[in-house]
Amino acid sequence: MASVADLIGNTPLVELQKLNTNINVKILAKLEGDNPGGSVKDRPAFNMIKSALERGDIKKNTKLIEATSGNTGIAMALAANLFELEVELAMPANSTRERVLTMEAYGAKVTLLESIEACRDYADEMAAKGDYYQLNQFANPDNVSAHYKTTAPEIWNDTRGAITHFVSAMGTTGTIMGCSRYFKEKNPAIQIVGCQPTEDSSIPGIRRWPKEYLPKIFEPQRVDSIMDISQAEAV
């Protein structure tokens, strides 16, 4: 029988014709909103839980905990529901009510704290007590491998390898790390461009991380250049 998990990935790649005024450049966007949970985060959430179960790191009675600013929480709640696991999600208090309700609808417990950094600290503390298992998207190689195994190959195949630049926001950095690794193996000349908010901008889902909170999966040598993006530019 088909599962919701079968709908994760293989999202469309479409050309942005209206936004691009340079006839010598083709800009393509991957519509990750078509994933069942509504974002690219379905890929790592499902892969992290599935891989942990296969390794025996977690059991069917394991309680999961994760810090998230939004989309990962929805994806984690969905994936945990699919695998019949309990999950608690720590989120910033300024998260939209709709996101919280969506996570709760999938069966997750949601704890609201003052910032994403506080959420990460809380998840670390709860996992250290032994009551929970933290997948830790910020340090989990299965976050990266999800994009190495699915996102990047899909883009490569859909473009038939005709890609010169890959541009990605940097939140957990799982997407840009996994795609960079794959694309550089295929063609080292492909430029990997990361986007982060300017110091005075707040863009939901991505951060300009303080050094002490940089994701452990982030390898700076895998990014050729970083662009600072204002909130107005992001919109």
What are these regions (language model features)?
Residues 1-235:
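PLP-dependent amino-acid enzyme catalytic core
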